[in-house]
């Protein structure tokens, strides 16, 4: 699994929607994106941890982790889109360390990180199998990989509701939040 040959198209779209990316994501999650990040991170990261934010975008997962730990962690933002990681100033008082690259070829040593954060980004891997292998490689022995993303609910009624929302409601919400760029969101959702 993974995006495979569609990866380039998705990355091109992500680059185009940078100006409205956070706003639209907040709208289409009905304002729950921040809550989901907090719930995933709380209690899973300790003071002094070294964190890789894989597929970091602007660094929202890292910012949440820093807030929860009162800034007592070390973070590295890692994303394939240089314009995303260059625009982190609005979230961070001190510029975090950044690196540009993909999930499948992570330029870090084995067992280097206490935790890896992936917020709404793992679905954009070229190869899910290789991405998982790479994250496992760079995590310390007892490290944690904290993933926040959309999924298909097990309950059939809930699954129908989510599918209906994604196909029928999300485009309207994305248009309201992102203007003409909303059409691009269909490629990544």
PLM segments and residue spans:
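N-terminal, positively charged/glycine-rich alpha-helical extensions of SAM-dependent methyltransferases
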Residues: 1-20
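C-terminal alpha-helical "lid/dimerization" subdomain adjacent to the S-adenosyl-L-methionine
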Residues: 8, 24, 64, 78, ...
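Conserved alpha-helix/loop element of class I SAM-dependent methyltransferases that forms part
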Residues: 30-47, 64
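Class I SAM-dependent methyltransferase SAM/SAH-binding core
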Residues: 52-105
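A short acidic, Gly/Pro-enriched loop at the edge of an enzyme's catalytic core
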Residues: 104-116
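A short SAM/SAH-binding and catalytic strip from SAM-dependent methyltransferases
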Residues: 115-127
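A short glycine-rich, Lys/Arg-flanked "PGG" loop and its adjoining helix->strand segment in the class I
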Residues: 129-141
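Conserved beta-strand signature within the Rossmann-like core of class I S-adenosyl-L-methionine
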Residues: 143-150
């Amino acid at each position: 699994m993974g995006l495979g040959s569609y990866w380039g198209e998705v990355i091109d779209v992500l680059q185009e929607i940078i100006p409205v990316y956070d706003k639209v994501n907040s709208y289409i999650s009905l304002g729950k994106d921040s809550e989901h990040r907090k719930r995933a991170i709380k209690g899973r990261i300790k003071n002094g941890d070294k964190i890789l934010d894989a597929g970091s975008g602007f660094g929202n997962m890292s910012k949440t982790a820093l807030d929860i730990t009162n800034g007592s962690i070390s973070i590295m933002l890692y994303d394939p889109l240089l314009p995303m990681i260059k625009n982190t100033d609005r979230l961070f008082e001190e510029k975090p360390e950044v690196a540009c690259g993909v999930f499948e070829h992570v330029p870090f040593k084995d067992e280097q990180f206490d935790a890896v954060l992936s917020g709404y980004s793992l679905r954009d891997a070229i190869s899910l199998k290789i991405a998982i292998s790479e994250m496992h490689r760079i995590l310390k022995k007892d490290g944690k990989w904290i993933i926040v993303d959309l999924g298909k609910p097990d309950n059939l009624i809930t699954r129908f509701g989510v599918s209906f929302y994604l196909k029928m409601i999300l485009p309207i919400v994305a248009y309201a939040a992102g203007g003409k760029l909303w059409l691009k969101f269909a490629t990544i959702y």
